[in-house]
Curated annotation (Swiss-Prot):
Protein name: 4-hydroxy-tetrahydrodipicolinate synthase
Gene symbol of the encoding locus: dapA
Organism of derivation: Chromohalobacter salexigens (strain ATCC BAA-138 / DSM 3043 / CIP 106854 / NCIMB 13768 / 1H11)
GO molecular function: 4-hydroxy-tetrahydrodipicolinate synthase activity
Family recorded in the similarity comment: Belongs to the DapA family.
EC top class named in words: lyase
């Protein structure tokens, strides 16, 4: 089971919108040097929904090659067509990803039975261990806890990224799945500390893009049950957690990476560059977190 800080990796792009492969490799190295425990390639923060299939595949392959087995790579393989999600998972397996992260099908709003059958098909046909990804604020499709419990009984479904931010739901998940090998990850940085302290196994984090060492230390403390140290680190990071949500992800974090000199000013429509009025908010949060100097 993977534990700790799992970065939801942004995909660096040039001003033209072209993927910046050299910057992507450097960004992977930045995480290897700063304690990140695992990397999600081409998850939501990586903008796969505005990539071609070939680009999506190439991002996963590039990250796998650069990591070279040093930490686990989780491939973002979600799609709202089950056959496409299976195909993406198969490709991720072929290039050496360790697991896949499969988001609830978006826009078409399946029933709970439809969600169950979708993920069952991905688990059986994709050939990789599957982490479910529940983010109803983006997908309009909510994987209910009871459906998670059903899916957790399937052999190749190994975890859940819960990005609801609902700690009551998280508590039920932890209580029901305690003692199993099923991993529970937060996908909501502002509530991740409490999620882990109640028994979660890690955080699939946007903030880790820019504060990897601090997020590693936070997750390490929280997973170990060190309440005092975890809250101490989290208090310092909370302004950054908040600032990275002032506009839709990954808009603020891509601006932050540019501010840090780790990426060019590149993002793809329909996402746009961070509004001027939020530049100072994100910049000040980076300083408070100790990521940049004033």
């Amino acid at each position: 089971m993977i534990t700790g800080s799992i970065v939801a990796l942004a995909t660096p792009m040039k001003a033209s919108g072209e993927i910046d492969w050299e910057a992507l490799r450097r960004l992977v190295g930045f995480h290897l040097d700063n304690g990140t425990d695992a990397i999600v390639a081409a998850g939501t923060t990586g903008e796969p929904t505005t990539m071609s299939f070939a680009e999506h595949f190439d991002v996963i392959r590039c990250v796998v090659e650069e990591v070279a087995g040093r930490i686990p790579v989780i491939a973002g393989t979600g799609a709202n067509a089950t056959s496409e999600a299976v195909e993406l998972a198969r490709y991720a397996r072929e290039v050496g990803a360790d697991l896949c992260l499969s988001v609830a099908p978006y826009y078409n709003k399946p029933t709970q039975e439809g969600l169950y059958q979708h993920f069952k098909a991905v688990a059986e046909g994709g050939g990789l261990p599957v982490i479910l990804y529940n983010v109803p604020g983006r997908t309009c499709s909510d994987i209910y806890n009871e459906t998670v419990f059903r899916l957790a009984e399937l052999e190749n479904i190994v975890g859940l990224k819960d990005a609801t931010g609902n700690l009551e739901r998280a508590e039920e998940l932890v209580d029901r799945l305690k003692g199993s090998d099923f991993a529970l990850y937060s996908g909501d940085d502002p509530t991740a500390c409490d999620f882990m302290l109640m028994g979660g196994h890690g955080d699939i984090s946007v903030c880790a893009n820019v504060a990897p060492r601090a997020m590693h230390e936070l997750c390490e403390a929280a997973v170990a049950g060190d309440d005092e140290r975890a809250h101490q680190i989290n208090t310092r990071l909370m302004p950054l957690h908040t600032a990275l949500g002032v506009e839709a992800n990954p808009i603020p974090v891509k601006w932050a990476l540019h501010r840090m000199g780790l990426a060019e000013q590149g993002i793809r429509l329909p996402m746009t560059w961070l509004s001027d009025k939020y530049h100072s908010t994100v910049s000040e949060a980076l300083q408070l977190a100790g990521v940049t100097e004033g």
